[in-house]
Amino acid sequence: VNHADIYPVLPRHRIDGLPESWLGVPPPPTGFSREGFHFREAIADRADIEMIHAWMNRPHTAKGWEYDWPLERWEAHIKAQLATAYSRPIVVERKGRPIAYMEFYRMAQDVVGHHYQAGPYDLSFHLAIADPADTGGGLGTTLLGTVIAEFFERDPRCDAIVLEPDAANGASRRMIEKNDAVHLGDVRVRHRHIALYAKVREGRDLPRLLPGHSTPV
């Protein structure tokens, strides 16, 4: 069964109106170790898919991501990411133990990237810490800072890392602000009211929201 024919895959992937050259941008950097963490691409095998599916169906991750999907949809979602340059599924390990799931993606090819002055190499990511016992102690803040630093180092053409937490998610916003990202404003994307943040490479200008895309706070 081709589960991609049954479930919508990469629902946020949007490339209409983008220059052809932007679609040739390589996928986000993966497969790196930094600050005691290893960030590897998820493998489209049973072990990784079942692990990620179990994590993302836990109450604390389902609330934030709304990705509490059946196993078959997760299989289709991971395979679809690995087949494009838009997004990559990531398993984060510490001392050999898997502790988090992330998705690295090119913001210009994402639905949110159509709400601000995105550049073709802009990067973003989402984070889900697997064990609720690991939340609230600074792990998320550390992981954000680690990935931001690595992105700028590994991708010299990336001038901005743009993050888009739910506007009402105070914990996520604090993690982002502790890493010196700047709030660009709020936008509404589908059913979500999000706060858009950016951290730019030293010497680069902050991107701006596109006219008419700002949502009152």
PLM feature segments, named:
Residues V1-R46, D205-V217:
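Conserved N-terminal entry element of GNAT/NAT acetyltransferase domains
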Residues R106-A108, V182-L196:
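Conserved catalytic-core motifs of GNAT/GCN5-like acyltransferases
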Residues G136-F152, R174, K178:
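Conserved acetyl-CoA-binding loop-helix of GNAT-fold acetyltransferases
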